[in-house]
Structure formats: structure tokens, C-alpha cells
Amino acid sequence: MEINDLTPAEQRVWRAFSTGATVDFREGGDDEDTAEGAQWGPERSIRATVLRALLLNGPRVPGEVAALKVKGARVTGTLDLRHATVDSIVHLSHCHFTDAPDLSGAHLPYLNLRDSVLPGLMIARARVDGSVRLTRCRFTGVVHLGGSHISGVLFLERARFAAVSETGPVLRLSHVTIEDDLCAPGLRTHGEIRLDGAAVAGSVDLNDARLHHPGNAVLDAQTLVVEGDLLMRRVEATGWIGLRGARIAGRFDLSYSRLSNPDDSALRASSCTIGELWLRKGPPLEGRLNLRRAQVDVLFLEPEVVPDEVYLSSLVYTTLTPHEPAERRLPMLERDAEGYVPHAYEQLATAYRRVGDDHAARLVQLAKQRRLRSTRAWYGRLWGYVQDATVGYGFRPLRAAVWLLSLLAIGSTAYALHHPHALKASEAPHFNPVFYTLDLLLPVISFGQEEAFAPDGWYQYLAYALIITGWILATTVVTGVTRTVSRQ
């Protein structure tokens, strides 16, 4: 391409390229609205074919570093760099593109399109040796970086993505590899972000993001691998967040966030491995919380954040914080959509025992037995009620002592007022109402009173009742103690 074939605006860019000088077409500086770029005239319009020619075979000056640095231009046509190898940095900020650039399979040292307006962007399977900066860009079409390798940071701060279709993604980052951070605080999307299979060596920052895709995925990040933190503080998400099979080495922080996807899951984090999961200081999730088969080292979960329906089957956590009374944690287990999940109760009890709160652990185990009772047949429920009333399933042993003392007082008083007659007056020992009642109550121990005396009338029925009650009490005590000892 000859310089004589270029417009005055293009000639400025051509001449500046060899020395890496910046060409700024803006008239209002940073206050200019790039969205009005469709109205810009030829004095600031650059053909995409000219930019392509510069990047692939532009002039070079010995001792200078060539670079494409343009601000405030209207780029017409498609910037086609498919499978190209570009050795100059590309800096096209505050620009208005008529067509989506296509850099699929390209190899670049650095790409900066900040504050630009684009109808889309294709950088699939590309390699960028430095960073990709899309800060404050506005996209009206799909941005596709799937399969790309970025050696630096991917910047998406306050970028905006408009809906393309009702179900399709607006930002495709599937299987992308980022050797540094994915920095996207204040991101705005109307559609799905697809981050499945991606690998981020640093952290992912989505703080203050506004993600909108009602009834569908706002963030689908299945099998995502993050070596640092996944930060989503103060996020407002309308739609579901999916992290099935993801691995987050650091903290997954949803503090102060509002997640809303009524009648479906708001957070799907099944089969995840997470260092720390923070769900705190926000309103209750509007939608289900799915943590099935997840493994979390530290679960920071405030009871106020838990939604009306959860999935906690096979969830494993080492530490549960903040420390709350068992009465505030148990409702979460009762909201499990799968009904009675014994593993969830065992996990909670283990977490309490780990911090030395044995009382709370016993309350959880008691609640587990009561929940199990509700799943049994009528005779199983009846036996459960007996165990609960007598010894609290073995977790309230003092209750057995109260029953024993109460029955002992009733029997002793009754037989003290009306002595049963001796079976053999010459051989009978002196009658003692207390030990006679103990003989009736205790199935194994004998004080010689029961065999020597026989009550009559309703006192005989009282004796039968004491014997039956004693056997029931002894059986429930043995069952409860066995359950407690085996658990220890």
C-alpha cells in the first residue's frame, strides 16, 4: 500500500507508526463520547485495511520501536488479522469500530482497545505475550477469546456487554489461559459470561459487577481453575452462577452480593474444590444454593444468607464460621431439597466438635435422630418418640435419671401408703418401699423385695407398669449409650 493512496487521517497514522508515536484525533479529550463515533467524518476515519497493512508490513526506522497507537478514530471495515504474527503493540483506544475485529489465531505482543465501542471482537485461539486491555469498552456483539493464551492480565474493568440473543453468551472465555489476573471490577453484562475450562494463574476480580440474564446463566464457569481468589463482592447477579467442578485455591468471596434466580438455582457450585467460600453480609439468596459434593476448607456462611432451599449432600468443609449456636445452623439442614441428608448433620456436628463445642454437636446429633424418625414407619416413629422422651436418643442422659427418680418417688409413695402382703410371712424380709420399687424398675438388679411381696388391686397394675417402664427405660439407655460410644 502506497502512502499516496491514503487519506490525510491515514497518512498521520502511517507516519507515526514507525516511531511508535500516538495519533490522537479526539477534539474533546477524555470527555468525548465514543458512542457517537458513527457521526465522525473522514477527518478521523481509518480503514481497517490500512491498519492491517501497517501491522503486517509497516515502515520501520532503525533505532525506533514501531507501534500502532491511535486514539479517537473511526475504524471502518473489518480489521482482519487472522493467524497473523504481529510484532508491534496494538493500542487503539477511544475508537469506534464499524465491524468486529477478527484476530483469531493471531500472535501479538500486546493489545489495548480501552474505551472503544465495538460490535464484537474475535480473539479465539490467539496468543498475546503481554496483556489484553478492554477497559471500559462497550460491545454490542459477542466477544470471543476462547482458547486464547494471555501471558499478562486480561483487563475488563467497567466494560459493558449488550445482549446478543436471549440464551447465547456475550463474553466467551472458554478454555482461555491467563498467566496473570482477570481484572473485571464493575463489569456490566446483559447475557452470559462463559468461563468454562479456563485457567487463571492469578485472581479473578469481579467486584461490583452487574450481571443480568434472568432465568439463564450469568456466569458459567464449570471446571474453572483459579490459583488465586475469585472475588465477587457487592455483585448483583440476576440469573444463575455455575461453578460445577471448579477449583479455586484461594477465596471465593460473595460478601455483600445479591444473587437472584427465583424458582431455580442461584449458585451452582457442586463438585467444587474451594479454599474459602464467603457468603456473608448480603440478603438471602433468591434461588437454590447447590453445594453438593463440594470440598471447602473454610466455609464462611451466615445463616441470614441461606435461601429457602439448599442442596448439601456430600458437602465437606473443615471449618465453619462464624461460630453460631446449633439452633441457628439447623434450619439450613432442614431446607435441603433432598429431604433427610445424614451426611450434612454429621458434617455440622464434626465442625462443632473440632472447635470444642460438644454441646452444640450433641444438639445436631439429636436433631439428626429426630429428622430420621420422620422418615420411618409408624412403629419406628413410636419407638423414636420413646427414646427421645426418655434419654434424648442418648444425647441427654440426665433425662433418664429424672425419669428414674420420678418413677421411684411415685412407686415408693404408693407402696409406703399401702404395703403389699408378704408371700411367706415367716421368710419375708422387712418391707422397704424404696427398694421394692427399685426391684420393679431395674430389670437386672435384685434386692429380694419383689420375690417376697405381692401387691393386689390397682397396686398390682402399678407394679406391672413400673416393670414395663423399667425395661423400656433400660433399653433406651443402652441404645443411646451404644450410639454415643460408637460415635466417639
Model-derived features with residue positions:
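Outer-pore turret/helix-boundary of cation channels
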Residues: 147, 197, 245, 281, ...
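Transmembrane alpha-helical segments in integral membrane proteins
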Residues: 412, 462-488
